[in-house]
Regions:
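Short strand-edge motifs at loop-to-beta-strand transitions and within beta-strands
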Residues: 4, 171-173
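Hydrophobic residues in beta-strands and at strand termini
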Residues: 8, 134-136, 166, 175
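Short, solvent-exposed loop/turn segments in extracellular or other extracytoplasmic domains
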Residues: 127, 165-170
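Surface-exposed interfaces of beta-sheet-rich extracellular modules
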Residues: 1, 143-144, 148, 152-155
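Feature for mature exported/ectodomain regions
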Residues: 10-146
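Conserved "repeat-terminator" motif of extracellular CCP/Sushi domains
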Residues: 1-13
Length: 175
C-alpha cells in the first residue's frame, strides 16, 4: 500500500467552484537527493511546458516530461513540498487506512499549474488535461510497479491508475 501524491486544482462545472486534488507518497530521504529548482522542459501542442522541481527525493529529473492538452499557451508546472499537501495526504491516508499509517510509505508533493511566467497559478483548468511523467521517488524505487498513486479530493484518496515505464534506465510513473 504505497501511495505517491500529486496536487492539482481543477475547476468543475460552472461558477467559481474548484476541486483541489492532492497526491501522496512518503519520503524520509536526506537532502542529498534534492534537486532544488531543477527545470525540465516538455513539449505542448503549439506551446511549451516547463516543469520546475523543488522537492527532496526526486532524482533523475532528466526524464521528466509534461504535456498540457487543450491549449497552445505556454505553462509552468511546479512540483514542490508544501505543509498543506502533506497534511491533506496524512488525513486522507488515515481516513482510508485508519489512524496508524506508520507501515505505509508515501511521498506527498504539490503539483500545480502556472502561466508561462510561473507567477500566476492557473485555477480554471476547464478544457485542459495534463499528462506528466516523473521518476519514481527515490524512497519508493524498490517498490517499482507496486507503487500506488493517488490525489486527495475532499479529504479522501482519489486513486489514480498510472502507467509505469523505464526511460533511459530510470523507473517512471506516467499519468
Amino acid at each position: 500500500n504505497v501511495t505517491v501524491t500529486a496536487n492539482y486544482t481543477a475547476k468543475s462545472g460552472s461558477g467559481n467552484k474548484t476541486n483541489k486534488s492532492t497526491g501522496s507518497g512518503n519520503s524520509t530521504n536526506s537532502n542529498s537527493n534534492r534537486r532544488p529548482n531543477s527545470t525540465t522542459t516538455g513539449n505542448v501542442s503549439g506551446g511549451r511546458t516547463t516543469v520546475v522541481i523543488d522537492k527532496n527525493g526526486l532524482s533523475n529529473t532528466s526524464v521528466v516530461s509534461a504535456t498540457v492538452n487543450g491549449s497552445s499557451d505556454n505553462f509552468v508546472i511546479k512540483i514542490t513540498e508544501s505543509a498543506s499537501a502533506s497534511e491533506e495526504v496524512v488525513k486522507a491516508l488515515m481516513a482510508e487506512y485508519g489512524n496508524d499509517i506508520s507501515a505505509i510509505k508515501y511521498f506527498p508533493m504539490d503539483i500545480s499549474l502556472y502561466d508561462s511566467t510561473g507567477n500566476n497559478k492557473i485555477t480554471d483548468t476547464t478544457g485542459l488535461s495534463i499528462s506528466i511523467t516523473l521518476p519514481i521517488p527515490d524512497s519508493l524505487i524498490t517498490y517499482a510497479g507496486n507503487n500506488k498513486v493517488a490525489g486527495v479530493v475532499n479529504s479522501k484518496l482519489d486513486k489514480l491508475t498510472p502507467k509505469f515505464s523505464t526511460i533511459s534506465g530510470v523507473s517512471c510513473i506516467c499519468l
